[in-house]
Every structure is written in structure tokens, then in C-alpha cells.
Amino acid sequence: MKYMIASDIHGSSYYCQKLMDAYQQEKPDRLILLGDILYHGPRNDLPKDYAPKKVIEMLNSISDSMLCVRGNCDCEVDQMVLDFPCLADYSVLDINGLFIYCTHGHLKPVKLKPGSLLLCGHTHVPALENRDGIIYMNPGSVSIPKENSPHSYMILEDCVFTWKDLETLSQYRYKEFPKSK
């Protein structure tokens, strides 16, 4: 299966449309959203073309392919308008033997086993780090990137994670994991 992984749309219809365009081009089986979907939050400036209703319409059009976790800017009202579950604090995936813990990143995760992958957003900065044997990965932010990082998302296919620039769809980082036997 092919997965598209994104985080921190924050209600930007402009960048959500770019994500939808990339979704159409990439043709993933699933879109994993790591939270902060509709609201920009009190610490962020309004993103370009802040229009949560348009974001709702775009994401609901692909609701059958969505897997989503709650971000610190998401709430019960969001669930009333979205056609896919969006309020779980985390999701655990086993993909080709990779144990992947998906969360937004604003809450401390449960204790993970060495070799596990922690996939989260929240910081708006793409990341790939080994933290005490746990691989931490962040796709960056769709709409409000920080620290001069690009508007970005990730692709997971055949145990290879690829970070992509949302503006150019070009790859700028990748990490391959061995497939389980």
C-alpha cells in the first residue's frame, strides 16, 4: 500500500488544495493526517486563504481514504463537520513489519519499544531523528512551515519514507527501512 502523510493544514484552503492536487498525482491508498486540520490556533497567524469550510469540503470528498489523529487545535466541533474520525489521540499501524505510532506530537507518547517509529506533526518542521532507539519522523506542515522549511508532506511506500515539497512535488529527503521477512 501507498500512504500519504500530512499535518497542520490549519484551515488553509490554498494549501489544502495543493495537498489534494498532490494526492491526485501520488494516488495513495490512504491519507494519514496528523492533526490540526481546520483551526489556525491562537499562536499562529492566519494561513494563506484561511477557509475551513472549503477544507472540510475537500477532505470530506476523500473521507474513505482518511486516517486521522487529533491535533492540539482540533475539537469536538470539527468531528461534527468532518466525515471521518479525527479525535483519536493516536493510531498504531503495523505496515510491512514496521510498528508506527501516529500522533500529533503535542502530548507525550506512550512508552515505545526501541525500533518503533514515532510519526507526528505539531512542530511544523520536517524531522528524521533517532531518539534512544526510537525513530522520530515529522512530515512538516502543509500550510504554516517553520524554520525555513518547505510546505511539505511524506509518502510511505514499500518501507521507504519520502519527504516532498508541496510546491514543487520534488523529493528532498528519504529514509528506507528493511522489510520484515
Sequence positions of predicted segments:
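Core catalytic region of metal-dependent phosphoesterases/phosphodiesterases
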Residues: K2-I95
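Conserved beta-sheet core of the metallophosphoesterase superfamily
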Residues: F84-L87, N96-D165, S170-Y172, F177
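Non-catalytic terminal accessory segments
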Residues: K179-K181
